[in-house]
Design a protein with these regions (language model features):
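A short, hydrophobic beta-strand-centered structural micro-motif
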Residues: 51-64
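Charged, amphipathic alpha-helical segments and their flanking helix caps
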Residues: 1-41, 45-48, 63-175
């Protein structure tokens, strides 16, 4: 190659619409849990989301990054999941009790999903349309809303979801 020559390298496939199917899968998992949350994809101001005491969950797309590809290539998908509730009681502690209850219900659903993915339950861990498998989902932070929009109370979770492409050819080995 001559010095100063421009080389165009094709981009490696980075998941396509995997992120959308993952978000839809999490929404479906929450909806099918019977927890009575109103679940939506995407973020909006909580004041516009018709939040009530049953709770609203917003599943929000974050960054998609490639992981360590030395053995099997995988992707990491960042998701933000916000849980919101409404309590009009002037006693602020009652609002904290509400959001604590909503957090407990949400976390039980996610813990069950994580457990089922660890057990390789295909209905829990395989994204059928894109062919990705959820290897793990880990909460990396949990932040309250600092009472910024009372009577609404909320919590934002940050998750990293690790996925592998089941369609990828590994040439029969780990190297």
């Amino acid at each position: 190659m001559r010095k100063g020559m421009l080389v165009i390298v094709p981009l490696k496939y980075t998941g396509g619409n995997m992120w959308l199917e993952l978000m839809q899968h999490i929404k479906s998992t929450i909806n099918n849990s019977g927890a009575a949350f109103n679940v939506m994809l995407g973020a909006m101001r909580p004041q516009a989301a018709k939040v009530d005491e049953n709770g609203v969950i917003m599943v929000i797309r974050g960054e998609t990054t490639r992981g360590d590809n030395s053995i099997q290539s995988y992707l990491e998908q960042e998701l933000y999941i916000e849980v919101w509730g409404r309590n009009d009681n002037p006693d602020l502690e009652v609002g904290y009790e509400l959001i604590a209850n909503l957090e407990d219900r949400f976390e039980a659903i996610i813990n069950d999903l994580r457990k089922r993915c660890g057990e390789l339950d295909e209905t829990a861990c395989i994204l059928q349309n894109t062919g990705y498998q959820i290897i793990d989902l880990v909460c990396t932070s949990k932040v309250g809303d600092h009472d910024s929009v009372r009577p609404l109370v909320g919590t934002q979770y940050r998750f990293m979801v690790r996925l592998i492409d089941l369609k990828e050819k590994t040439n029969g080995g780990i190297f």
